[in-house]
Amino acid sequence: MTSAAPPPLSAIALICTLKGRDAPSSSDLIADQLLGQLRSGGVECEKVRCVDLSLLPGVEADMGEGDDWPALLAKIKSANILVMSTPTWVGHMSSVAQRVLERLDAELSDQDHAGRPRMVGKVALAAVVGNEDGAHKIVADLFQALNDIGFSIPAQGCTYWNGEAMQGVDYLELDQTPEAVATTTAAAARNAAHLAEVLRQSPYPPYAGPD
């Protein structure tokens, strides 16, 4: 008897642009490209533009009436891979991305049956765009926070584009995607899917023994 094939891996991309759903967004575009690479590897993908939700300030899993975070958190918990896509503003990630990290911080105290924080075993990717410097710092900040919360970071798990200094061309205005960006995006997606499958088949050991 052959065992049933495991379900496909899944990914959710949180688009942390400051622009609403109807506005073109470079953060949305680079996330789409990353999700496209994940889909080509058999990963089921979804994306959410966070600015269209009411993500209330705070560090609790549910901040009460009017908070859309619990529904979004449920999607993050059900996915194997989290993609954080953010623009660069004044050299930093967007305020929306920072809000997401603050809300995820509550998950440190939510443990599974083996005493592991709920996000342990999930994989995180970062995508950053901007026409100013800052991508490396933003990726470092994102990965420090996400790893602290419990996410695993794959090898070369980020993709980014920064335009020339003192000019106003956005990523979505380019005639074509630079080869270096496309190659980096493909590698990040490939490595994330690989790591997610490894962690699904061989989870991290328990943090605490049975009572």
Regions found by a protein language model. Give the residues of each.
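N-terminal beta1-alpha1-beta2 submodule of the flavodoxin-like/Rossmannoid cofactor-binding fold
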Residues: M1-A114, L172-D211
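Short, glycine-/small-residue-rich phosphate/pyrophosphate-handling segment
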Residues: H113-E164, A180-T183
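Ligand-binding pocket scaffold of soluble enzyme catalytic domains
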Residues: S3, P7, A11-L18, A126-V128, ...
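Short amphipathic alpha-helical oligomerization segments
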Residues: A165-V169, E173
